[in-house]
A protein has these predicted regions:
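S-adenosyl-L-methionine
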Residues: 16-67
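A short glycine-rich, Lys/Arg-flanked "PGG" loop and its adjoining helix->strand segment in the class I
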Residues: 92-105
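Short beta-strand to alpha-helix junction loop
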Residues: 110, 214-222, 248-254, 289-306, ...
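Active-site substrate-recognition segment that forms the wall
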Residues: 141-143, 149-156, 161-179, 188, ...
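Dinucleotide-binding Rossmann-like beta1-alpha1 core, especially the glycine-rich loop
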Residues: 201-280
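Helix-loop-beta segment of a Rossmann-like dinucleotide-binding subdomain
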Residues: 210, 235-245, 268-308, 404-408, ...
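C-terminal catalytic lobe of FAD-dependent flavoproteins
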Residues: 267-269, 433-508
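Helical element adjacent to the flavin cofactor pocket in flavoenzyme catalytic cores
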Residues: 290-336, 340, 344, 348
Length: 508
C-alpha cells in the first residue's frame, strides 16, 4: 500500500525510474498500469495477481479514516516523506496511532527521519525503536517493531463455491484461482454467461460525475480497474477501442460540461467537437462528446470461458444449486446430483440470489437488444458510440443497438421495444437502418444503481450489476476475494459501505 498526495505524471515517473536500469521491465509495467490522478484507492495487480499494490491518492490524514479496517493488519511500514520540519502533517500522533492499530505482532517499520517528536509518537504507541546507520547518503535511520499481541494471519488455501457463471462469477473464479484457491463454479446453464449476460457484445465504460459520491467514486475506480483487468488477460475478446459518449440533450451536456470543468488534463477523456466526433467515427454525427480511450467492449461468453479455463477451477454446468447450509466451520452445498463441502460460498447468480437470501432493493429488468445490418457507412466503425442507446462496431454482418429497459417477463422479441431501440439510435445514426432480429436478456438492478458486494451471514454476495457488469464486476470480485483472504480491500470504507448487500434493509 502506498499513499501519494501529489502523484507523478507518467513521463516524470519514467524519467525517475530510468536511473534504475536493473528494474527496467518492472518500471515499464508499473508506468503502464499507473492510474490517472483521481482521489481514492486504486488497485494494481502484478505477476498474474500474486503481487498487489493498493495506491491511495490523496492527503494521508484525510484518507486514513476511509481505510480503517479492524480485520486488516500490515506486515511492514515504510515512511518516506520530506523531513518533519517541511512536512509535519505526515508525522502526527494520529498516524502513529493508526499504524499501531493496523499492526500485528511481527509488524516492522522504518524511516529515514530520527526527529525527537516522531520517536515520541511511536514510543507512545509502544513500538520498540532502534536508531540505525543510514543507507546511501543518509546518516541515520529509525526502525521499530510493533508490540501488538495480534497474531499474523496466514492466508490458507481454501475450497470456494461460486453460484452463477456470468461476468461476476467468472471474474471472481479467475481471481480466487489466481491466488491459489480451489474453486467450484455452478450454473444451471450449459456454459458461462448464457443467462442474464447472454449478449455477444457488452460495452465497458464509466458513468461519471464531477462530484465525489460513493456512486461516482465506484464508477470511476471500477472502470479503471476493469480496463487493467482485461488488459492483464491479454485476450482477443477484449477490445480496448475507446468509447464515444455523446452530449445530445440538456442533461448529458450539463454532465459533460461539469466533467470538463473538473478535469482539464484529457487523460481520462478527450472532448470532441461534432466535426471531430464525425471524423473519428467515419460518418456524420450531429453531436460532439467525450471519448474515453481506456474503455472498450467484450465478448462476454468467450471471455468468461477464458476466465474459468484454469486447473484450479472445477466447472459444474447444467447443475442447479438447490440448498446451501451453513455449518459451524464450513458450508454444505447440494445440487440434484451431489453434495459439496466448502469453506466459503459466493452468490453471483443475479436475480436468483434470493433463492438463498432475503435481499431488499433489487429487481429484475428486461432488456432487448436489436440487430441491424451493416452497410458501407457503418462497417468501418471501430468503437461503440453511446447516447440514449448505443451502437456497436460490426459483429459478423450486423451491429447491436439497444437496449430497452422494461418490467416485462416475456422472453420473446417485442416490436415496440425494437422501435424504442431504433428511436434511440437515431441520435447517433439515422440512415439506411435494416432491422435483423435481436435478443432478450434480464438484468438485476438495485434501487440506487450500485451493485451488492459484501458478506451476509457468512455468505459472500456479488450481484446487482445491471447493465454495467462488464465494468463493475471485476472490482467487486477483487473486493470479495480480499474479504475471503482478510487482505487489504481494493475499495475504501466510503465505497464499501455503499456496496453493502444489506444496505436497503438498514435504510428501511
Amino acid at each position: 500500500m502506498s499513499f501519494e498526495n501529489r502523484p507523478f505524471v507518467k513521463k516524470d515517473l519514467l524519467r525517475v525510474l530510468s536511473q534504475y536500469p536493473t528494474f527496467l521491465n518492472e518500471s515499464k509495467e508499473l508506468v503502464s498500469k499507473l492510474p490517472l490522478n483521481a482521489k481514492g484507492l486504486h488497485r494494481i495487480n502484478f505477476a498474474n495477481g500474486r503481487i498487489t499494490l493498493s495506491l491511495i491518492y490523496g492527503d494521508l490524514n484525510e484518507t486514513l479514516d476511509e481505510l480503517k479496517n479492524p480485520l486488516v493488519k500490515y506486515d511492514a511500514w515504510y515512511l518516506d516523506g520530506f523531513s518533519p520540519a517541511k512536512n509535519p502533517e505526515m508525522w502526527t500522533a494520529e498516524i502513529a496511532s493508526y499504524m499501531a492499530a493496523a499492526s500485528h505482532s511481527e509488524t516492522t517499520f522504518s524511516t529515514y527521519t530520527v526527529a525527537g517528536f516522531v520517536k515520541q509518537n511511536f514510543e507512545k504507541e509502544n513500538f520498540s525503536l532502534s536508531k540505525l546507520k543510514g543507507f546511501g547518503n543518509k546518516r541515520s535511520m529509525l526502525a521499530g517493531r510493533s508490540s501488538s499481541t495480534q497474531k499474523k494471519v496466514i492466508v490458507k488455501k481454501k475450497t470456494i463455491g461460486i453460484v452463477g457463471a456470468g461476468i461476476a462469477g467468472c471474474s471472481l473464479a479467475k481471481i480466487l484461482a489466481g491466488r491459489g484457491h480451489n474453486v467450484i463454479i455452478f450454473d444451471k446453464e450449459d456454459g458461462p454467461s448464457k443467462a442474464a449476460t447472454g449478449n455477444p457484445f457488452l460495452v465497458a465504460y464509466p458513468r461519471l460525475s464531477a462530484h465525489d459520491s460513493p456512486y461516482a467514486r465506484f464508477s470511476l475506480h471500477s472502470y479503471l480497474f476493469s480496463s487493467r483487468f482485461y488488459d492483464d488477460m491479454n485476450t482477443k475478446f477484449w477490445k480496448k477501442s475507446g468509447v464515444l459518449m455523446l452530449g445530445f440533450d440538456e442533461n448529458s451536456l450539463k454532465r459533460e460540461t461539469a466533467l470538463c470543468n473538473a478535469r482539464k488534463d484529457e487523460v481520462l477523456f478527450e472532448k470532441l467537437s461534432k466535426k471531430s466526433a464525425s471524423e473519428k467515427a467515419g460518418f456524420k454525427i450531429n453531436h460532439g462528446g467525450l471519448f474515453f480511450k481506456d474503455a472498450g467492449y467484450i465478448d462476454p461468453e468467450r471471455l468468461c470461458e477464458e476466465m474459468v479455463d484454469d486447473v484450479l477451477i472445477e466447472k459444474k454446468f447444467k447443475e442447479e444449486v438447490q440448498v446451501i447450509v451453513k455449518k459451524s466451520d464450513h458450508f454444505s452445498l447440494k445440487t440434484k446430483n451431489d453434495e459439496y463441502v466448502l469453506d466459503h460460498v459466493c452468490l453471483c447468480n443475479a436475480f436468483m440470489v434470493n433463492q438463498f437470501t432475503n435481499l431488499r432493493g433489487i429487481s429484475k429488468k428486461r432488456g432487448q437488444v436489436s440487430y441491424i445490418s451493416t452497410n458501407a457507412t457503418l462497417k468501418n466503425l471501430k468503437f461503440p458510440i453511446c447516447a440514449a442507446g448505443y451502437l456497436s462496431p460490426k459483429n459478423g454482418d450486423k451491429h447491436l443497438i439497444g437496449s430497452s429497459y422494461s418490467k416485462s417477463d416475456s422472453t420473446k422479441l417485442i416490436q415496440t421495444e425494437h422501435d424504442e431501440n431504433l428511436e434511440k439510435i437515431n441520435i447517433i445514426y439515422d440512415q439506411n437502418i435494416e432491422l435483423k432480429g435481436g435478443r432478450v436478456g434480464f438484468r438485476t438492478v438495485t434501487r440506487d444503481r450500485l451493485p451488492l458486494a459484501g458478506v451476509i451471514d457468512g455468505i459472500h454476495i456479488n450481484v446487482g450489476h445491471g447493465s454495467k457488469g462488464s465494468t463493475s464486476a471485476p472490482l467487486c470480485s477483487e473486493y470479495i476475494a480480499d474479504l475471503i483472504d482478510g487482505t487489504v480491500p481494493p475499495v475504501d470504507s466510503f465505497v464499501a459501505k455503499a456496496l453493502k448487500p444489506d444496505r436497503f434493509k438498514i435504510r428501511n
